[in-house]
C-alpha cells in the first residue's frame, strides 16, 4: 500500500498503465530482493524509497542451473518466506494463459494455505513419496484454508475430480491438474517449469 500511495503522490498525471507497471515492478522486487534473496533480504523501505520499486536482482548472463540451485532451498515447504511468491507466480502464469478457459475467467482471491498436491499423509494404504520431492515447489500450490482442510489427505485424482465442478484456487494448481499422473517425475517437471517462469521474468518487459 505504501508503494502504491507513494507512486500516486509523486505522479503529476495518473495513468493506469504506468501505475500497473510500477506495481508489477514493486511485486517483483519484493519477491526477488526480499523473499527469495540469497542472503539477508532488502528492507521494505529500501525497496520502495531507495530503489524506487525497481528490482535489483538481475539475471544477466547467469547460468540457468546456477540460479535454479540457488532458489531451490527458498522454494521448499517451510522455507518460502511469504505467500507473495505464489501470488506473483500466479500473476505471471495468468498473463501467459489468460486467453483460454478456465484461466480467462479466473479471479484472484485471498488464499492463505500452502497445499501439498500429493498429500503429506495420503488416506488409506496409499504410498508416501520421498520427502524432498513431497516438499518441493513442484508439489506446492496456494489454496484457501477451508479447501486445504477438506482436501488435504485426498490423492491428486480425487482433488482433480473436486475441481471439475469448482474453479481452481490458483493458476499453478490448474496447471498441476493437467498432468494425467501426478508422481515424482511430474512434480519435478512442473517444478522446473515454474522456477523457469520466475527466472525468465527478470529479463521480461512489464506485462501491463
Name these PLM-found stretches:
Residues 1-208:
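Flexible coil/loop and intrinsically disordered segments
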Amino acid at each position: 500500500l505504501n508503494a502504491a500511495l507513494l507512486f500516486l503522490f509523486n505522479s503529476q498525471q495518473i495513468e493506469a498503465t504506468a501505475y500497473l507497471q510500477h506495481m508489477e515492478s514493486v511485486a517483483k522486487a519484493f519477491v526477488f530482493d526480499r523473499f527469495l534473496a540469497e542472503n539477508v533480504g532488502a528492507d521494505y523501505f529500501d525497496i520502495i524509497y531507495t530503489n524506487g520499486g525497481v528490482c535489483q536482482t538481475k539475471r544477466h548472463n547467469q547460468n540457468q542451473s546456477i540460479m535454479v540451485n540457488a532458489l531451490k532451498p527458498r522454494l521448499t515447504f517451510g522455507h518460502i518466506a511469504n505467500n507473495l511468491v505464489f501470488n506473483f507466480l500466479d500473476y505471471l502464469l495468468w498473463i501467459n494463459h489468460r486467453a483460454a478457459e478456465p484461466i480467462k475467467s479466473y479471479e484472484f482471491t485471498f488464499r492463505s494455505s500452502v497445499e501439498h498436491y500429493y498429500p503429506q499423509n495420503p488416506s488409506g494404504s496409499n504410498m508416501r513419496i520421498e520427502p524432498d520431492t513431497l516438499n518441493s515447489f513442484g508439489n506446492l500450490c496456494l489454496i484457501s484454508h477451508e479447501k486445504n482442510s477438506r482436501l488435504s489427505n485426498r490423492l491428486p485424482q480425487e482433488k482433480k475430480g473436486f475441481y471439475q465442478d469448482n474453479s481452481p484456487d490458483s493458476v499453478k494448481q490448474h496447471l498441476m491438474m493437467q498432468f494425467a499422473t501426478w508422481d515424482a517425475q511430474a512434480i519435478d517437471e512442473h517444478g522446473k517449469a515454474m522456477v523457469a517462469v520466475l527466472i525468465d521474468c527478470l529479463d521480461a518487459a512489464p506485462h501491463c
